[in-house]
Amino acid sequence: MSIRCGDTLLFQTLPVIAAGAAVGGKKEGEGPLAAEFDELSADNRFGQSSWEAAETYLQLRAARLCLQKAALPQEKVQLALAGDLQAQCTASSYAMRELGVPFAGLFGACSTMAEGLALGAASVSYTHLRAHET
């Protein structure tokens, strides 16, 4: 359970990030953070026929890498929070459908990452506290 202090949520049990993964294209590979990516491709379309398909591949590949690093089978995922800048979270929807996990699409433009972290933390906190009731 969280306590609200103004616009801030304070969690009694701190949420954790068990794993993360990042996949990037040519520009990311040329940048100063290239070594931080799990996978880079010189082909900005990752062998896909369109930008939309490439964005779907990016999300799917990053999700699979993250699950692998966390040693978590996809069947154990109860909810995925994901977003992209395509109309109605197209890439996210296709990637999560292929992964076969429950999905909530986020569209906040530049705030999507922060939105996902906040919603994820609140969801984990609530679920953790209610677990004793089942």
Residue ranges and their predicted role:
Residues 1-104:
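Conserved "HGTGT" condensation-loop signature of ketosynthase/thiolase-family condensing enzymes
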Residues 62-66, 116-123:
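Buried hydrophobic packing segments
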Residues 72, 122-126:
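Secondary-structure boundary motif
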Residues 127-134:
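Conserved small/polar residues in nucleotide/adenosyl-binding loops
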